């Protein structure tokens, strides 16, 4: 069986935290900011943690990723 490879798209989008959780960035942050409130834009800047339902699948894509 061939080696598993790290999914490069996922490797660019997710980072592991010190406790082993996965950090991600929010969607809706690339354009069309005029109709978004300042509060919404401020909240979108912060990182989010991957939900437990998605964790197993994403963690499998990042098999060998250290950080």
From Swiss-Prot:
One of its GO terms (biological process) is translation. GO terms for cellular component: cytosolic large ribosomal subunit. Gene3D superfamilies: 4.10.410.60. Keywords: Ribonucleoprotein, Ribosomal protein. Residues 1-41 are annotated as: Disordered. The keyword Ribosomal protein applies. It holds the Pfam family Ribosomal_L35p. It comes from the Bacteria. One of its GO terms (molecular function) is structural constituent of ribosome. Disulfide bonds: none annotated. Belongs to the bacterial ribosomal protein bL35 family. This is Large ribosomal subunit protein bL35. The lineage of its organism: Bacteria, Bacillati, Bacillota, Bacilli, Bacillales.
């Amino acid at each position: 069986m061939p080696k598993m490879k790290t999914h490069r798209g996922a490797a660019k989008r997710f980072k592991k935290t010190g406790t082993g959780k996965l950090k991600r960035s929010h969607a809706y942050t690339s354009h069309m900011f005029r109709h978004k409130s300042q509060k919404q834009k401020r909240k979108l800047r912060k990182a989010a943690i991957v939900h437990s339902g998605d964790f197993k699948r994403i963690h499998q894509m990042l098999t060998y990723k250290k950080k």
